[in-house]
Amino acid sequence: MQDELFETEKAPQKNAKNAKNAPKKSFEEHVHSLERVIDRLNDPNLSLKDGMDLYKTAMQELFLAQKLLENAYSEYEKLQTPNKKA
């Protein structure tokens, strides 16, 4: 369970079957993916369509990274409160 706390499934795929079988990514992997996308978004020769696709990808990575942070914070709070079940 502890490992699951810090990993999410990769960003949703168009095909739902692929999303279920996708390997999990860590918070750091989501942040790294987000950084790569931001670098690509800074390309002045990027088309509008490609920019929008990259923006969607960035938002998915950000959402998943935020979920991991929320999960970690929730677990932290449970550990700080000994009266509650962890």
From Swiss-Prot:
InterPro entries xref list: Exonuc_VII_S, Exonuc_VII_ssu_sf
SUPFAM superfamilies the record matches: XseB-like (SSF116842)
Catalytic activity: Exonucleolytic cleavage in either 5'- to 3'- or 3'- to 5'-direction to yield nucleoside 5'-phosphates
Class in the EC hierarchy, top level: hydrolase
Domain of life: Bacteria
GO biological process terms on file: DNA catabolic process
Principal subcellular localization: cytoplasm
One GO CC term, this protein: exodeoxyribonuclease VII complex
Subcellular location per the Swiss-Prot or TrEMBL entry: Cytoplasm
Record-level Gene Ontology MF annotations: exodeoxyribonuclease VII activity
Alphabetic keyword roster: Cytoplasm, Exonuclease, Hydrolase, Nuclease
EC number of the protein: 3.1.11.6
Annotated region described as Disordered, given as residue ranges: 1-26
Gene3D superfamilies hit by this protein: Exonuclease VII, small subunit (1.10.287.1040)
Functional summary from the UniProt entry: Bidirectionally degrades single-stranded DNA into large acid-insoluble oligonucleotides, which are then degraded further into small acid-soluble oligonucleotides.
Quaternary structure and interacting proteins, as annotated: Heterooligomer composed of large and small subunits.
NCBIfam families from the UniProt entry: PRK14065.1, xseB
Membership in a protein family: Belongs to the XseB family.
Record's protein name: Exodeoxyribonuclease 7 small subunit
Taxonomic source organism: Helicobacter pylori (strain J99 / ATCC 700824) (Campylobacter pylori J99)
